[in-house]
């Protein structure tokens, strides 16, 4: 995890994501690895533009949502996750954008493709 954190500070988001993903695979209960992976995705999203960039935040949001349950209720980690999830929600595509792309069903499967960031998530409507 220290290597992932260092790589993230050095703006090597893809390398950080790789290490965080490996740590998460070795220990799925490691909430810190999930947080680091979500942060790396958010940092890496800057390499893309427009809609592709925005959908990365769906994926990062999902990762944080799964990490949230790994921490004690009301813990500082949960509070930080909640703040970050709120920030990510503000970066989601607008409902108008989703409509124009034919993505009108919240919860429908969606494959994110933004440079080195790929993954399956679901369409999330802005509340």
Go through the PLM ranges and name each one.
Residues 1-2, 32-36, 80-83:
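Alpha-solenoid helical repeat scaffolds
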Residues 1-29:
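Alpha-helical adaptor scaffolds
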Residues 17, 21-25, 52-90:
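TPR/TPR-like (Sel1-like) alpha-helical repeat modules
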Residues 5-11, 38, 43-52, 86, ...:
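Short coil/turn linking the two alpha-helices of tandem helical-hairpin repeats
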Residues 31-32, 75:
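Helix-start (N-cap) detector for alpha-helical repeat units in TPR-like alpha-solenoids
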Residues 90-127:
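N-terminal alpha-helical interaction modules that lie
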């Amino acid at each position: 995890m220290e290597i992932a954190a260092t790589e993230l500070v050095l703006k090597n988001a893809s390398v950080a994501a790789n290490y965080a993903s490996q740590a998460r695979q070795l220990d799925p209960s490691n909430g810190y690895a999930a947080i680091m992976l979500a942060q790396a995705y958010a940092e890496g999203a800057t390499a893309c533009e427009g809609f592709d960039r925005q959908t990365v935040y769906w994926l990062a949001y999902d990762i944080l949502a799964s990490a949230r349950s790994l921490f004690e209720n009301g813990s500082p980690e949960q509070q930080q996750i909640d703040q970050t999830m709120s920030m990510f929600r503000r970066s989601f595509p607008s409902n108008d954008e989703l409509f124009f792309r034919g993505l009108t069903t919240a919860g429908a499967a969606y494959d994110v493709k933004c440079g080195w960031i790929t993954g399956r998530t679901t369409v999330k409507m802005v509340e």
